[in-house]
Amino acid sequence: MNLILYQRDDCHLCDLALDVLANARVPEFQSVFIDDDDKLETRFGERVPVLHDDETGRELDWPFDPVAVRNFLADTAIR
Protein backbone atom coordinates (compact mmCIF):
# COMPACT_ATOMS: atom_id res chain seq x y z
CA MET A 1 0.00 0.00 0.00
CA ASN A 2 1.40 3.38 -1.02
CA LEU A 3 -0.54 6.14 0.74
CA ILE A 4 -0.34 9.80 -0.17
CA LEU A 5 -1.92 12.69 1.70
CA TYR A 6 -2.56 15.50 -0.75
CA GLN A 7 -2.59 18.82 1.07
CA ARG A 8 -1.79 22.54 0.94
CA ASP A 9 0.55 24.82 2.83
CA ASP A 10 -1.10 26.69 5.69
CA CYS A 11 -4.21 24.50 5.59
CA HIS A 12 -5.86 24.00 8.98
CA LEU A 13 -7.93 21.08 7.66
CA CYS A 14 -4.72 19.45 6.45
CA ASP A 15 -3.24 19.84 9.93
CA LEU A 16 -6.35 18.18 11.35
CA ALA A 17 -6.00 15.36 8.81
CA LEU A 18 -2.42 14.77 9.96
CA ASP A 19 -3.69 14.43 13.53
CA VAL A 20 -6.38 11.98 12.39
CA LEU A 21 -3.80 9.85 10.55
CA ALA A 22 -1.64 9.80 13.69
CA ASN A 23 -4.63 8.79 15.83
CA ALA A 24 -5.51 6.07 13.32
CA ARG A 25 -1.90 4.88 13.60
CA VAL A 26 -1.27 5.02 9.87
CA PRO A 27 2.25 3.61 9.70
CA GLU A 28 3.62 5.37 6.65
CA PHE A 29 2.45 7.86 4.05
CA GLN A 30 3.79 10.60 1.82
CA SER A 31 2.69 14.21 2.10
CA VAL A 32 2.32 15.90 -1.27
CA PHE A 33 1.59 19.62 -1.42
CA ILE A 34 -0.52 20.63 -4.40
CA ASP A 35 0.10 24.39 -4.22
CA ASP A 36 2.73 24.65 -6.96
CA ASP A 37 1.48 21.87 -9.24
CA ASP A 38 -1.19 22.92 -11.74
CA LYS A 39 -2.15 19.32 -12.53
CA LEU A 40 -2.66 18.41 -8.87
CA GLU A 41 -4.40 21.73 -8.23
CA THR A 42 -6.88 20.94 -11.01
CA ARG A 43 -7.41 17.40 -9.77
CA PHE A 44 -7.75 18.08 -6.04
CA GLY A 45 -8.42 21.82 -5.72
CA GLU A 46 -10.79 22.44 -2.84
CA ARG A 47 -11.00 18.72 -1.97
CA VAL A 48 -7.80 18.69 0.08
CA PRO A 49 -6.93 17.03 2.29
CA VAL A 50 -7.33 13.78 0.39
CA LEU A 51 -5.87 10.41 1.40
CA HIS A 52 -4.98 8.49 -1.77
CA ASP A 53 -3.87 4.88 -2.22
CA ASP A 54 -1.52 5.03 -5.18
CA GLU A 55 -1.76 1.27 -5.80
CA THR A 56 -5.55 1.07 -6.13
CA GLY A 57 -6.44 4.66 -6.96
CA ARG A 58 -8.94 4.76 -4.09
CA GLU A 59 -9.37 8.08 -2.30
CA LEU A 60 -10.76 9.22 1.01
CA ASP A 61 -11.90 12.84 0.97
CA TRP A 62 -12.04 15.09 4.00
CA PRO A 63 -13.76 15.04 6.42
CA PHE A 64 -12.57 11.73 7.85
CA ASP A 65 -11.94 10.41 11.33
CA PRO A 66 -9.72 7.59 12.65
CA VAL A 67 -12.49 5.01 12.17
CA ALA A 68 -13.02 6.04 8.54
CA VAL A 69 -9.27 5.89 7.93
CA ARG A 70 -8.97 2.41 9.45
CA ASN A 71 -11.94 1.23 7.36
CA PHE A 72 -10.36 2.74 4.24
CA LEU A 73 -7.10 0.92 4.97
CA ALA A 74 -8.88 -2.37 5.68
CA ASP A 75 -10.99 -2.11 2.51
CA THR A 76 -7.90 -1.26 0.47
CA ALA A 77 -5.94 -4.19 1.91
CA ILE A 78 -8.72 -6.61 0.92
CA ARG A 79 -8.72 -5.50 -2.73
Can you name each region flagged by the protein language model?
Residues 55-79:
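Non-catalytic, surface beta->alpha helical segment in thiol-disulfide oxidoreductase systems
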